[in-house]
Amino acid sequence: MQSHIRAFVLDKDRKPLMPCHAAKARKLLKKGKAAVFRRFPFTIILKERTREASAIQDVLVKVDPGSKSTGLAVVRKDEKNVHHALAFICLNHRGSKIRDALTSRRQLRRGRRSRNLRYRAPRFLNRKKPKGWLAPSLQHRVDAVMSWMNRLTRLVPVAGFVQELVKFDTQLMQNAAISGVEY
């Protein structure tokens, strides 16, 4: 997990304010006007200032999902609708590690069940998955992104979320002349 650019700021009531530059955060800490609230993502809490006395702009959290990693960008919009990046976070997913651990468990379980045990009733596929079930590696990806989105709403005055939805035709990218039955 990596984070860049700004320090998150909370007021004395732990309500989120606009992120500030790292140098400004250092000056506030040195003067005693702020204290370190959290080390990652680096967050300071102001000792005197409140949200009402601060200028707050609209902040968006942009999500770029991927199979191995997901990118989160905290951006603010100015008057001309130009986005300025405040922070970048890269979440590296553990999907392949989860899959490997489940494969190992499955192999051990099948080894136990294939032993020659007499007088045991045979097992059949008698288990149904609940509605909305996702594979554990995919569920981890969803849970990790959702937990970071919730965490960012506590650290930044978020006005909305934007998710990049992209579909790629990988067969067409490999072979431009593909058509019909070849698909």
Which residues fall in each region the model found?
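Positively charged, helix-rich recognition surfaces that bind polyanionic ligands
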Residues: S3-R26, K30-K33, F37-I56, P65-T70, ...
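Short glycine-aspartate micro-motif
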Residues: L60-K62
